Amino acid sequence: MAAMTYHLDVVSAEKKMFSGVVQKIQVTGSEGELGIFPGHAPLLTAIKPGMIRIVKQFGEEEFIYLSGGILEVQPSVVIVLADTAIRGTDLDEAKALESKRKAEEHINNSHGDVDYAQASAELAKAIAKLRVIELTRKAM
């Protein structure tokens, strides 16, 4: 028996990152983690900075960093419109570690809500990139 699947498109402002048949995806929505399986109810939600975990048609996994965006779920197709999307294999670990260090430094030295909020957002993005790098390595 063939696994149930649906079509997924992951698109950023720069290019189409993924287009193909998948078994499921996992992504961080505005209200928390979402697992999208075939037959999921229609949904439109914001995506928080993090990753999308894609389980392809034959079980192979792929991880893509998303800086945020929109997730649209329809009966036979799911579309991710990302602000920025970077494949796990294309992320620079040294750069992500440096971004994390700088964000932590800004948080510790912030003077006001705006500085703190911006530094917290940058820290979340850096941590998400590092997580995608880690999971991509494990999947290889």
Curated annotation (Swiss-Prot):
GO terms for cellular component: plasma membrane; proton-transporting ATP synthase complex. Transmembrane segments: none annotated. GO terms for molecular function: ATP binding; proton-transporting ATP synthase activity, rotational mechanism. Keywords: ATP synthesis, Cell inner membrane, Cell membrane, CF(1), Hydrogen ion transport, Ion transport, Membrane, Transport. The keyword Membrane applies. Its main location: membrane. It is found in: Cell inner membrane. It comes from the Bacteria. CDD domains: F1-ATPase_delta. It is a peripheral membrane protein. Produces ATP from ADP in the presence of a proton gradient across the membrane. Belongs to the ATPase epsilon chain family. F-type ATPases have 2 components, CF(1) - the catalytic core - and CF(0) - the membrane proton channel. CF(1) has five subunits: alpha(3), beta(3), gamma(1), delta(1), epsilon(1). CF(0) has three main subunits: a, b and c. HAMAP family: ATP_synth_epsil_bac. This is ATP synthase epsilon chain. It comes from Yersinia enterocolitica serotype O:8 / biotype 1B (strain NCTC 13174 / 8081). The lineage of its organism: Bacteria, Pseudomonadati, Pseudomonadota, Gammaproteobacteria, Enterobacterales.
